């Protein structure tokens, strides 16, 4: 599917990036998320493919952080449609336990997100980023989502 030099990874600001740069930004934002527990921080990486000299975003990896916890989301173009996959933590206490539950949370996008959608495993997150730099590999998140989606479905 991918030929040499027909894709690259970029940040939202259109700046091409490397794994090392993304890893450094992740570490910096992770530390900040521990210091300011009511502000979420994030990192988004896009896989830009070049087809007939026209660049387009085919996959995105979004990482939100709050209080040292990570929320992972993948947007993936499959068959002309975008599919979204979230990491689901099968070891979370109860799917309906919400975290964070700060009434004055700065980022309302994370207010009342179920605890089962967060992980504290920074090494796993680093591996997900590293895989993404390998031609947009998002299998860890997709496989996790497919395997554990029942956890969220049973509480709908």
Identify the role of each PLM range.
Residues 1-123, 127, 131, 135, ...:
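Acidic (Asp/Glu-rich) sequence patches and key acidic residues
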């Amino acid at each position: 599917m991918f030929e040499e030099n027909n894709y690259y990874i970029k940040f939202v600001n259109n700046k091409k990036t490397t794994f090392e740069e993304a890893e450094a930004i992740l570490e910096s934002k992770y530390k900040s998320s521990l210091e300011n527990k009511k502000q979420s921080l994030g990192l988004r990486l896009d896989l830009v493919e070049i087809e007939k000299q026209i660049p387009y975003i085919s996959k995105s990896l979004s990482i939100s952080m709050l209080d040292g916890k990570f929320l992972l989301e993948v947007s993936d173009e499959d068959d002309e449609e975008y599919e979204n996959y979230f990491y689901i933590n099968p070891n979370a206490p109860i799917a309906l336990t919400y975290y964070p539950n700060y009434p004055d949370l700065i980022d309302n996008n994370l207010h009342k997100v179920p605890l089962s959608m967060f992980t504290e495993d920074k090494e796993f997150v680093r591996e997900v980023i590293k895989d993404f730099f390998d031609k947009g590999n998002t299998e860890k998140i997709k496989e996790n989502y497919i395997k554990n989606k029942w956890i969220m479905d049973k509480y709908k």
